[in-house]
């Protein structure tokens, strides 16, 4: 798994952005929750798309990261030197 492999890196990405169905990875039922919590603790900023969270009715289930607007996600992507998408 790519996300699990990130914890083996010395230098982490500045941001991980979760959109669409990927927002489910940030919920309590996700098997990746401990990995994401560790990435966040190590300094990786986790951003979760507010629109996706609302569309999937997961408002009260997000347990890691910060729920942000689509506009802010777009700003992050436009200001980044590199964007890798999975």
What are these regions (language model features)?
Residues 3, 33-37, 74:
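Short amphipathic alpha-helical segments and helix-helix/interface helices
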Residues 61-71:
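Active-site regions of enzymes building and remodeling cell-envelope glycoconjugates
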Residues 75-85:
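C-terminal binding/interaction regions
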Residues 1, 30-34, 65-67:
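Charged helix-capping and loop-helix junction motifs
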Residues 32-58:
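A glycine-rich helix N-cap at a beta->alpha junction
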Residues 1-29:
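Conserved mixed alpha/beta catalytic, RNA-binding, or beta-rich assembly cores of soluble enzyme
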Residues 13, 43, 64, 80-81:
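Short, well-ordered alpha-helix to beta-strand connector turns
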Residues 24-29, 55-62:
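Glycine-rich, charge-decorated loop segments at or immediately adjacent to ligand/cofactor-binding or catalytic sites
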């Amino acid at each position: 798994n790519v996300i699990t492999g990130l914890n083996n890196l010395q230098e982490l990405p500045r941001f991980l952005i979760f959109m669409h169905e990927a927002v489910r990875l940030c919920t309590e039922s996700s098997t990746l929750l401990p990995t994401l919590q560790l990435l966040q603790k190590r300094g990786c900023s986790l951003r979760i798309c507010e629109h996706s969270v609302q569309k999937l009715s997961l408002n009260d289930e997000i347990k890691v990261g910060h729920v942000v607007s689509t506009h802010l996600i777009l700003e992050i992507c436009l200001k980044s030197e590199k964007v890798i998408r999975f």
